[in-house]
Amino acid sequence: MLSVAILAAGKGTRMESSLPKVLHKISGKSLLQRVIDSCAELKPDKIFVITGHKSKEVQKSIPKDKKIHVVVQEPQSGTGHAIQVLCSEVKKHEGKLLVLNGDVPLIRPTTLKRLLYLHDSKNADVSLITTKKTNPHGYGRVFLNGDFIERIVEEKDCNELERENPLINAGVYCFNWGNLSEIINTLQSNNNQKEIYLTDTISLLKNSLSLEVEDNGELQGINNRIHLSECEECIQNSIKEKHMLNGVTFINKASCSISEEAEIGKDVIIEANTHIRGNTKINSHCIIGPNTFIENSNVGLQCEISNSTVYDSQVMDHIKIGPYSHIRPNSKISSYSKIGNFVEIKNSQLEEETKVNHLSYIGDSIIGRSTNIGAGTITANFDGQKKYQTKIGKNSSIGANTVFVAPINLGESVTTGAGSVITKDSKDNSLAISRTKQVNIENWKKKKS
């Protein structure tokens, strides 16, 4: 039986934030969620998330899962105290207990599996991950006696000689839970921090082993915004390298960010300052960017999107969008269409070969195929209380500066006169025009200021 305890109770004061440290995000996921995801790959029987500081806020972020249980640590008196609280709330202490911090977002499931294997194969009481750092400042130092761990001394309790030891405690432990539960309540806060250290269990358990791993960044704990940025960069480099090896070109990869869920086809070019978020799929032979943001959207084959934003929408094949277009949620732009500069599309469906080239707002609308929308066209869809739909049939030609006051339904091959305010439905093959007759007054004298 395997149980996991994730320590997520700390204040994270060095983050200088009102947000709990474990809720800060890297590439769209919180630190805590990343640790939960890594642990879930071990297929544990239970995952305990130990919260404390702003516990309710942290609990709201935890996914609903029968295997995940929340334990509240009050007050927060150290890592050893956290496990004391856990042991007091859980009646059966069976099998193995894996303990790790909620601020190590890069920890790999393969590394955790290696720790579990070492623990089982050596029948250890406790096994923990260690690594050597050229600058071990801030970490507890691990002292070995042959193959066994003799003791761990926290940074603030080290003397000058002990501080020279480069072998540090990564804060990832695997315990025989039964043996741990027998000694956990004997831990005391006899240290400079006046906290109960989990590391003090090492000297109380007989068979304590170390799994030394290479310092490759996966054990980096997040203590400040610099660490957060470094981990973000590490994850982003990994994501972008994967895509480049699969045939994607980044013009300036350092200026771009890509979500882990995103799918990008071959021969796609990602220009500078482009950000692809969420469950976005970009098919082959597209040019995306520069200065473009796409989130939770599907982009078809051979599309070009520049200096624009696309949210929760479908962009089909052979479409050009931008510059300075805004495609808002629940929109579908069908193939061979063109969305030009300063155009906003919201909750609308544009059929094939539709053009909206300039300075227009299309909201809550259905636009038929091969329709041309003139510059300055507005679908006035809101009466102050409710939103209404505009329908325009295929092969229509909408004059510049037309305003449609919804709800309204235009047939196929309809033409509207420039500057019209259309308030009534129009049949197929009709001209809709609504504007006052022009009056020219000769010899007009301007008013003097």
UniProtKB/Swiss-Prot annotation:
Q: Tell me its family.
A: In the N-terminal section; belongs to the N-acetylglucosamine-1-phosphate uridyltransferase family. In the C-terminal section; belongs to the transferase hexapeptide repeat family.
As to how many cofactors bind and how, the note says: Binds 1 Mg(2+) ion per subunit.
Q: How does it assemble?
A: Homotrimer.
What is one process in the GO biological process aspect for this record?
Answer: UDP-N-acetylglucosamine biosynthetic process
Q: What is its EC number?
A: 2.7.7.23, 2.3.1.157
Cofactor(s) of this protein = Mg(2+)
Instruction: Enumerate the residues binding UDP-N-acetyl-alpha-D-glucosamine.
Output: 7-10, 21, 73, 78-79, 140, 154, 169, 223, 328, 346, 361, 372
Predominant cellular place of this UniProt entry's protein? cytoplasm
Its protein name is Bifunctional protein GlmU
- The question of whether Secreted is a record keyword is answered with no
Q: Which HAMAP family match?
A: GlmU
Per UniProt, Mg(2+) binds at D103, N223
